[in-house]
Every structure is written in structure tokens, then in C-alpha cells.
Amino acid sequence: MAEAATRSVGKVTQVIGAVVDVAFEGELPAILNALETDNNGNRLVLEVAQHLGENEVRTIAMDSSEGLVRGQQVIDTGAPISVPVGDETLGRIMNVIGEPVDEAGPLNTAHKRAIHQDAPAYVEQSTEAQILVTGIKVVDLLAPYAKGGKIGLFGGAGVGKTVLIMELINNVAKAHGGYSVFAGVGERTREGNDLYHEMIESGVNKHGGGEGSKAALVYGQMNEPPGARARVALTGLTVAEHFRDQGQDVLFFVDNIFRFTQAGSEVSALLGRIPSAVGYQPTLATDMGQMQERITTTTTGSITSVQAIYVPADDLTDPAPATSFAHLDATTVLSRSIAEKGIYPAVDPLDSTSRMLDPMVVGEEHYEVARKVQSTLQRYKALQDIIAILGMDELSEEDKLAVARARKIERFLSQPFFVAEVFTGSPGKLVALEDTIKGFKGLVNGEYDNLPEAAFYMVGSMDEAIEKAKKLAAA
């Protein structure tokens, strides 16, 4: 703390859990400035939230405030919280204030960046509607992701959210040469640890951030104070913005965006603000908007964000998920009933939506094929009760054909993943958009009515399905 001579120095006057009040003799630090103090040998960062008058500021602690005492010295850093950014962050885990927490040594980067930034000006943003090809058939065909867009990922426990996220990280690195940033916001520490090790096992990252790592991890888990959970998404976003400004197409994952709102609500209550609807903070829409508006495509690069969304009590009208929905361009819904059939990725082709599925954006052919696929699957869904009660024999010939095609489509929507290769033994497949459209076009037009259902399960392109059918016939 030798720099104390040149910076404003204050004293702790009150500690109430995560809220710490600090009094300054001279100039008061600006709102959102980071203050630092030494808490039993550990650096504790406090973020200024309010000016109380009487030369006092109210701050939110980014770590546990246990051990702080009144009268303790606090130094104003003169700037917001700044975190390391750059290629050195790949394969590493850091916390909300940019400190490495993976026991793999210090994180030395050439650049640091403040976590509070303005959204890019409108003139810097790219207005062209483009889709981000993921190489995953069901996503690219039925609910394509917008480059620089926001995607909501819905799904219960154990339906394959993590595997889908890892495959997206892998495919974006392969197809676009882009990096990914994963922000773990208020989720289980065990899951964060599992994800880190699974990424190393599946080759997405190298141990200790070695050469070839494709993703940076930023964690503020459930056990952290609300200040850390409310800011960790911004830390992850700051790392992603640096890659975008280097000309990259970046994938930014947030798991879970609801916890960002929840932490904001806790902080708001601690600061004494009057709560709004359902007890949420009155600044809910502003907090969400400030973060989401930073996720966009600029003339240099793009940040495409995939956000897992927890829906409290399955109530879609709850203010937290409802505020998130306003920002989404696409939704990917994972379904347990599809996972139970053994079809992975278990993306629900009828519930998942995208505003990019528009003939003006994806083209007439893609749009027509996608709509035909959905109508065939919808018809099958409508007939399922009849089949369950009366059996297939009672259906008309036309309906029997529709059911047979729908079952083939269902299986063709599955595909082997690169990141699951180590568990399944099947080599992963990255399918080009043209091959996806061509394959499904043939299916809905009846060109492959002669092939068995099994030929379409867990293959990449239609050529592989035809090969598989030949092998099945020969067996």
C-alpha cells in the first residue's frame, strides 16, 4: 500500500455484511470506483455504490467482509474494477476481480480493462443480419443463432446443457477460429469444477491454460457474496469484448442469467432501495439492459451470447425471466422427453425459436425446408394419441407416411458430438449448413422413404445416412 500517498485514503466506519461504509477526509471516490483494503492479508475490493453525505460512501464488498474492523484504512484506486484480458486468460479460471483461482500460477497479461463500459455506439454496430453457423443440424436448420445475438438456453437438470455448451465452444473455435468466454454466475461450485475438468478431458482447454485452449472461465459461484455474483457477468463480458475488439467472433456463455438478477436484487435490498414487483430491484430493467446492450456485433467482430435461463417455479411471467426474454433473438429448448428417446442433442424442434428464421435472412429454400420439417413433426405429435390408443394400423396411408418421415427426421436431428467422443466412441461431426438443408429437403420430399429409420440415427450428413443404410442392409 505504498501508493497510499498519492491516492485518497479513507477509514471503515460501518460493516453490515456485504455493505461497508467508508469515510474520506478529502475528495470522495466516484460511484463504481474500486476501493482496496487489506483484510487479514487478503486484498479485499469494495465497489462504491452510494454517496451518503457527511464525506461517507457506501460500498459493496466483492468478497467476504468478515475480519474487517472500524477505522481500518481503505485506498481509492481511482478507477472501476479492472481485470486482465487477452489470450493469456484462455484455459484459466478467474474470479470477479480478475484473480486466478485455478492454482495454475499468476495471470500475467499485457492489458487490463475496466468491467464497466458503455455499449458500442450505434455507428460502430453492424446492422447486417447474419447467422452464426454452429455445425449442429437442429440449431442451424430450425432455430439459427444470430451473429452478435442473444440466445436463451432452457432445460432441466441432466438433459445435456453442458455438453451442448462445450460443443458450441469447440465448433466455433473450429469453424470460425473464435474464442469463448464462460461466466459462471451464482451456480454450484461443483458444476463449475466439473465443467473445467470436462473441458480439459474433451480437448476444449489445456491444463493450466496451455497452447490450444479455446475458452476463458470467469466464476462467481453460489457461495460468493452478492456483490461478486452481481458483477461476475460483467467481468466475463469484459474479457469477451477484448477478443471482439481484436476482430474475433466470440461466444459468451452465461450460466445462469437469473442469478445475475437475483444478486442485483440482494444488493439493492442491502442498499436500502424500495423493492419493486415480486421483491425485485427497482432498477431491474436498467441493470439487464446495460449488460445485454454490450453484447453485440461491431464493425470489427461479434459477441454471440448463449444464456442459460432458470425460470423460478416455471413461471415465465416472473419479472426476472420476463426481462431477459425482451433481449433474446433465439431460444434453444432442451426437452427431457427427447433425451429419454436417446436423441442428442435433445433440442425440442417445435419449442425452439429464432427471429433469424426468416426468408429475407436465411433464404427461401432454408425457410421452406425448416417449415416443412416442423409441420411434419407437428403432425406426428398430433397423431401420437391415436397411435397410442389404436395403433399404427388404424392410420390412413397418408398419415402412415407422415409418421414414418417424422420418425426419420427426429433421428436425423441427432448427431455425434466431438466433445462426447471420449465417452461414446463415435467420432464427432460438424455439418455444413448446405448439407443440413439438402439432407432435410430430401427427407421431407420423400427421396429417402426407402431407407430404414436406424440409418438416420447419430450421423452427420445425408451421405453418411445412405452409407449406414447400405451397411445395415448388408448385415
Swiss-Prot record:
Q: Which family does it belong to?
A: Belongs to the ATPase alpha/beta chains family.
The gene name on file is atpD
Please provide the record's keywords in A-Z order: ATP synthesis, ATP-binding, Cell inner membrane, Cell membrane, CF(1), Hydrogen ion transport, Ion transport, Membrane, Nucleotide-binding, Translocase, Transport
| SMART domains (alphabetical) | AAA
Q: What class of enzyme is it?
A: translocase
* Annotated protein name in UniProt: ATP synthase subunit beta
EC number(s) from the headed UniProt entry: 7.1.2.2
- Amino acids binding ATP: 155-162
The record ties this protein, via SUPFAM superfamilies, to:
C-terminal domain of alpha and beta subunits of F1 ATP synthase, N-terminal domain of alpha and beta subunits of F1 ATP synthase, P-loop containing nucleoside triphosphate hydrolases
Which HAMAP family does this UniProt record tie to the protein? ATP_synth_beta_bact (MF_01347)
Q: Name one Pfam family in it.
A: ATP-synt_ab_N
Q: Where in the cell is it found?
A: Cell inner membrane
> Domain of life of the organism in this record?
Bacteria
Q: How does it assemble?
A: F-type ATPases have 2 components, CF(1) - the catalytic core - and CF(0) - the membrane proton channel. CF(1) has five subunits: alpha(3), beta(3), gamma(1), delta(1), epsilon(1). CF(0) has three main subunits: a(1), b(2) and c(9-12). The alpha and beta chains form an alternating ring which encloses part of the gamma chain. CF(1) is attached to CF(0) by a central stalk formed by the gamma and epsilon chains, while a peripheral stalk is formed by the delta and b chains.
According to its UniProt entry, the function of this protein is described as: Produces ATP from ADP in the presence of a proton gradient across the membrane. The catalytic sites are hosted primarily by the beta subunits.
Provide GO CC annotations from the record: plasma membrane; proton-transporting ATP synthase complex
- Annotated catalysed reactions: ATP + H2O + 4 H(+)(in) = ADP + phosphate + 5 H(+)(out)
Transport is among the record's keywords: yes
Bilayer topology term: Peripheral membrane protein
Q: Name one GO molecular function term.
A: ATP binding
> Which Gene3D superfamilies does the record associate with it?
2.40.10.170, Bovine Mitochondrial F1-atpase, Atp Synthase Beta Chain, Chain D, domain 3, P-loop containing nucleotide triphosphate hydrolases
